[in-house]
């Protein structure tokens, strides 16, 4: 299809869309403690609402990018932003009514925004064919995954502290509506050269399989309170539906993902690395570090309205600054090499946090947040997203970015479930927070190991893969 919009217009729309998604993912971070109090519930329950959002985002990410290949990516992304706004309104009403159930419903609908970033990267690749320019702009867009210089976290903390947490959701809704208009009128429509019918039966099998596995993981995270009969039943269901999905993909003329692609290291090694990375660090930076900063017994004792200035803001700002540079470095030294250096740096940031968190001063948390922002948000995050694009086959460009987005959201959801469960099982306080951080570090170490299994991109020189 002919391109009539400028790259600047396309970038503007895509940045607004990514920011709208990021608000749903991180704007609530400094407000989680306040939400627990306003809704008269537990930290575990609030953490579960976060898990629900990321689980829904993971499930939608499994198939929406591929659907965009067929019906048009602009049309799909616009619809996603509209539905996200609806979910935000429902979540805001939960704050007005004090209903935790309504919050769960709203957060589930908001999860439709899950594959926003991969869709934007695919649309950007269509608009910017030059690899070097694309790499730099990709770094800018992907860095938004950490927030725009922490403005989202600052606003979230300030709004929650002064107007209640429902005001955070009203703000999200407004930005999502703006994003819908921007995408509709500032970008061009694009599809694959020969659109094919969607494999809806295969999609159903895959969503049920992954959904069952996610619910099982969330149940396991309850540790001694877990219902193990439910866990066993869900694991069996996940296995059965994945086998049905595998058979369907081998029998249908137009599979969602061919068996060959599913079994390649380009797919499973990348997805495993993404899940391990996100599980290891996401809840730490977006929940546990702000919790340490606000703790009055062993932490810095900061208020909800200023905690973001010391943690989430520098974390996001460092990631935003590093993103374009990381994209440039990837083109010179290779995505995989830069990814590994980033993971090592993220491990160092967690090690510093482990040894300094007891009685931690605000400046220590600031240092940790900056280092994690440079290494994870600005480097690892960019490399994992970039690999999802460069490892994708030309005949199915939406499948791997979509599955990778699902892996990002899956890992984020598991992160809140697992790390908060570890923290709770150890009694909270200093020991609980330390146990969660150690668990995260172990998971990051595993991610570093699996990163060596990711292959070079087909048709790419070694330095660019």
Language-model-detected regions and their locations in the chain:
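Extracellular/periplasmic helix-loop-helix junction of adjacent transmembrane segments
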Residues: 31-60, 99-105, 306-310
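Conserved MFS/SLC helix-loop-helix module at the cytosolic interface between two early adjacent transmembrane helices
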Residues: 59-98
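Hydrophobic transmembrane-helix bundles of small-molecule transporters
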Residues: 161-273
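Paired small-residue
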Residues: 87-90, 98-110, 363-371
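Membrane-interface helix termini in secondary transporters
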Residues: 34, 62-66, 70, 158, ...
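12-transmembrane solute porter fold
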Residues: 7-22, 28-29, 43, 87, ...
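Central cavity-lining transmembrane alpha-helices of secondary-active solute carriers
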Residues: 51-66, 118-122, 313-325
């Amino acid at each position: 299809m002919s391109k009539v919009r400028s790259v600047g217009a396309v970038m503007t729309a895509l940045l607004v869309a990514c920011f709208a998604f990021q608000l749903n993912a991180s704007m609530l971070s400094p407000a989680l403690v306040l939400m627990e109090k306003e809704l008269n519930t537990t930290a575990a329950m609030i953490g579960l609402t976060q898990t629900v959002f990321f689980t829904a985002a993971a499930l939608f990410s499994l198939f929406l990018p591929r659907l965009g290949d067929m019906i048009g990516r602009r049309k799909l992304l616009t619809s996603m932003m509209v539905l996200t706004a609806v979910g935000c309104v429902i979540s805001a009403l939960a704050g007005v009514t004090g209903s935790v159930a309504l919050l769960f419903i709203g957060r589930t609908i908001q999860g439709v925004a899950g594959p926003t970033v991969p869709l934007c990267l695919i649309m950007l690749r269509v608009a910017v064919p030059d690899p070097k320019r694309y790499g730099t702009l990709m770094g800018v867009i992907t860095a938004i995954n950490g927030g725009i210089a922490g403005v989202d976290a600052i606003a979230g903390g300030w709004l929650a502290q002064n107007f209640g947490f429902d005001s955070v959701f009203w703000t999200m809704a407004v930005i999502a509506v703006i994003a819908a208009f921007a995408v509709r009128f500032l970008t061009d429509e694009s599809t694959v050269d020969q659109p094919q019918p969607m494999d809806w039966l295969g999609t159903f099998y895959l969503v049920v399989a992954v959904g069952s596995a996610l619910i099982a993981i969330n149940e396991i995270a309850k540790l001694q309170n877990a219902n193990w009969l439910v866990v066993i039943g869900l694991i069996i269901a996940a296995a059965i539906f994945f086998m049905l999905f595998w058979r369907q993909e081998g029998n249908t003329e137009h599979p969602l993902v061919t068996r060959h692609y599913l079994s390649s290291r380009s797919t499973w090694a990348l997805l495993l690395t993404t899940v391990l990375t996100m599980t290891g660090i996401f809840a730490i930076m977006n929940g546990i570090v702000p919790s340490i900063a606000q703790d009055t017994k062993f932490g810095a004792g900061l208020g909800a309205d200023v905690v973001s200035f010391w943690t989430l803001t520098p974390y996001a700002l460092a990631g935003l600054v590093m993103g374009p540079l990381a994209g440039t470095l990837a083109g010179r030294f290779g995505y995989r090499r830069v990814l590994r250096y980033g993971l090592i740096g993220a491990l160092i940031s967690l090690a510093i946090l482990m040894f300094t968190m007891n009685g931690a001063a605000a400046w220590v948390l600031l240092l940790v947040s900056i280092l994690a922002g440079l290494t994870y948000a600005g480097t690892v995050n960019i490399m994992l997203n970039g690999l999802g694009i460069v490892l994708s086959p030309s005949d199915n460009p939406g499948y791997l970015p979509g599955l990778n987005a699902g892996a990002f959201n899956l890992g984020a959801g598991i992160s809140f479930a697992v790390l908060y469960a570890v923290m709770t099982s150890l009694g909270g306080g200093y020991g609980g927070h330390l146990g969660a951080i150690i668990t995260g570090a172990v998971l990051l170490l595993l991610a570093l190991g699996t990163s060596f299994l990711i292959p070079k991109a087909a048709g790419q020189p070694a330095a660019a893969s």
